[in-house]
Regions:
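Nucleic-acid endonuclease domains
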Residues: 2-253
């Protein structure tokens, strides 16, 4: 007698949502493959996604944008890639380091190295001040933003950045020269320090082409809840590139 038991079809397993961190790992692996160098650490993501990006990233090599390098991103290192020997490529501004930044969607934010997701104590150490409480640090940041901004700029733009946006498939090689005259801008905050519980964004006041003044958000500061001790600082990168365009050279890959 035949077995009349039927095999039920296996339900489709929903595809896991790709996190921003996963996008970053895939992007770094694609840079490694473009240079033909080992990826520093375990890699458990889609090699097919890596292979889609690698041909465009080979322009880093063929266009002499950044020299031969090694992947140095593990264990919280400051730089994602470090050049072999001194100096950099013709587009590297003489830096021996390269940062890889990514976002899933256009209009995203990028964090500075070292202080972008640090403990408040580390943030204060970099500023040369004593840490007391989050409330006092919020007040200090808002009262001394022209001291804070150069430090954040340095930890973000002191080396070239290769920046990838997944949804638009956009890859840009970004180098900065000098820094803005922060004292020439007027600033406003979305929340003053006494009303700042989670996050507050810094806006600069600029004039548009018609001479009208408007506020543009360039930076977000976030203090996490008690379950997480670190703070987060992120540039609104597309607006930063536009508002301070005179300080950037951008190459589309």
């Amino acid at each position: 007698m035949e077995d009349e038991t039927t095999t039920q079809p296996t339900p489709d397993v929903p595809k896991a949502t790709l996190k921003t961190e996963d996008t970053g790992k895939i992007f770094e692996k694609a840079i490694c493959d473009a240079y033909g160098i080992p990826y520093d650490g375990p890699f458990q993501y889609s090699q097919a996604d890596v292979d889609n990006l690698t041909p465009r990233l080979k322009r880093l090599v063929t266009d002499n944008l950044f020299p031969a390098c090694v992947h140095t991103a593990s264990k919280g290192a400051r730089y994602d890639f470090t050049a072999l020997g001194s100096g950099g490529g013709s587009g590297s501004g003489g830096s021996g380091h390269l940062s890889a930044k990514s976002n899933k969607k256009k209009g995203g934010k990028i964090a500075p190295q070292v202080v972008g997701q640090s403990h408040p104590q580390k943030f204060c150490q970099e500023l040369g001040i004593e840490y007391t409480t989050p409330e006092n640090l919020k007040q200090y940041i808002q009262a001394n933003i022209m001291t804070v901004l150069p430090m954040l700029w340095k930890y973000t733009f002191d080396s070239p950045i290769v920046y990838y946006v997944k949804d638009t498939n956009d890859i840009r090689f970004i180098t900065a020269s000098g820094s803005p005259d922060w004292s020439s801008f007027q600033y406003v905050w979305t929340r003053t320090h006494d009303k700042w519980t989670n996050s507050s964004s810094l806006k600069v006041i600029i004039e548009d082409g018609c001479g009208k003044r408007k506020e543009e958000s360039i930076l977000e500061f976030q203090f996490h809840t008690k379950s997480r001790q670190n703070m987060a600082v992120r540039w609104t990168i597309d607006k930063v590139l536009r508002i301070f365009s005179g300080h950037f050279t951008v190459v589309s890959l």
